[in-house]
Amino acid sequence: MNNDNDDSIEIIGGVDPRTMATRGEDESRDSDEPSLTDLVEQPAKVMRIGTMIKQLLEEVRAAPLDEASRNQLREIHATSIRELEDGLAPELREELDRLTLPFNESTAPSNAELRIAQAQLVGWLEGLFHGIQTALFAQQMAARAQLEQMRHSALPPGMGKPGQAGGQGTGQYL
């Protein structure tokens, strides 16, 4: 979704936050496309699991693990993904399924395989969190723009914005 004046920014999946602020609240409510904040059904759960996964990645990086530890981390990784999926809408579940590959069940994963899998999951979660922050910011900007528009339309004739001279008014002035 590139425009001629897009400054080489491409928005992948979702609404461009630069245009979100110019849309009215009614228009965004009528949209068939759910917002990113609606796609995370249990945000607290997703945040807790994301924090845990990030900490596990730090542990995997810090020291070499024996076979039993690697097997346990493989199970934790699979359980974490299942738990994450419970907190996500179907669209995000499908995306997560496409991006995560299961470990080989017959052998313990190597330290490198664990690091890659954990880093991939942490990166996906951080992207999700940044997307949510962007969506919330865009919603705030849209609400602010709508409030300013309401304030401006509520001013009596002849009154301008604060700091501006009054416009063309009706009636006589003393």
From Swiss-Prot:
Residues 1-37, 153-174 are annotated as: Disordered. The keyword Ligase does not apply. Interacts with the core proteasome alpha-subunit (PrcA) through its C-terminal hydrophobic-tyrosine-X motif (HbYX motif). Interaction of Bpa with the proteasome stimulates proteasomal peptidase and casein degradation activity, which suggests Bpa could play a role in the removal of non-native or damaged proteins by influencing the conformation of the proteasome complex upon interaction. The gene is bpa. A motif (HbYX motif) lies at residues 172-174. It comes from Mycobacterium leprae (strain TN). GO terms for biological process: regulation of proteasomal protein catabolic process. This is Bacterial proteasome activator. Forms a homooligomeric, either hexameric or heptameric, ring-like structure which stacks co-axially with the proteasomal alpha-rings. Pfam families: BPA. The lineage of its organism: Bacteria, Bacillati, Actinomycetota, Actinomycetes, Mycobacteriales.
